[in-house]
Amino acid sequence: MRKLPITREGYCKLQEELEKLVKVVKPSVVAAVAQARELGDLSENAEYHEARKEQSFVEGKIRELQLCLSEAEVIDVSQFTGERVKFGASVTLENMESKSVLIYQIVGNLESDIKEGKISVSSPIGKAVMNKEVGEIVEIDLPSGKKTYKILGVEFRQS
């Protein structure tokens, strides 16, 4: 079985999402199905069919999260030190052309979220900076074209 790297924070978020689906969302969907069933003829009961569709979606999401959690390997980022980019590192990058500064945390596919500044280790930026050190220049192939960045800092912190 393949193991998928994930930070402790990411693992906890997935567990919380699963718990909410199992304890709150699923029971309410099951109740909606039962209530719609009481309305009579199921062949023409739009409420029933909609509730069943929602139930299937929720059950699928629960199975997906259970599988993700079973395949997850929690990496304790707080144990890492140094100036080399590793999984879980927060990396400060300077665009060599525009001089703009970006900070990203390198995380697993299960927890990447660009809005939170978390990018996947398998993304173009993640691949380009992995195992590089502070001060190194990296060229990254992005959809918008090649960009050159300097690694200004590497930090390991457990959020």
Swiss-Prot record:
Disulfide bonds: none
PROSITE patterns assigned: GREAB_1
Coiled coil (UniProt feature): 45-67
Gene Ontology MF terms in the entry: DNA binding; RNA polymerase binding
Tagged with keyword Transcription: yes
Annotated Pfam families: GreA_GreB, GreA_GreB_N
Keyword annotations from UniProtKB, A to Z: Coiled coil, DNA-binding, Transcription, Transcription regulation
InterPro entries attached to this UniProt entry: GreA/GreB_C_sf, TF_GreA/GreB_CS, Tscrpt_elong_fac_GreA, Tscrpt_elong_fac_GreA/B, Tscrpt_elong_fac_GreA/B_C, Tscrpt_elong_fac_GreA/B_fam, Tscrpt_elong_fac_GreA/B_N, Tscrpt_elong_fac_GreA/B_N_sf
Biological process (GO), any one: regulation of DNA-templated transcription elongation
Top-level taxonomic group: Bacteria
Family statement drawn from the similarity comment of this UniProt entry: Belongs to the GreA/GreB family.
Listed HAMAP family: GreA_GreB
Function as written in the Swiss-Prot or TrEMBL entry: Necessary for efficient RNA polymerase transcription elongation past template-encoded arresting sites. The arresting sites in DNA have the property of trapping a certain fraction of elongating RNA polymerases that pass through, resulting in locked ternary complexes. Cleavage of the nascent transcript by cleavage factors such as GreA or GreB allows the resumption of elongation from the new 3'terminus. GreA releases sequences of 2 to 3 nucleotides.
Protein name, per record: Transcription elongation factor GreA
Gene: greA
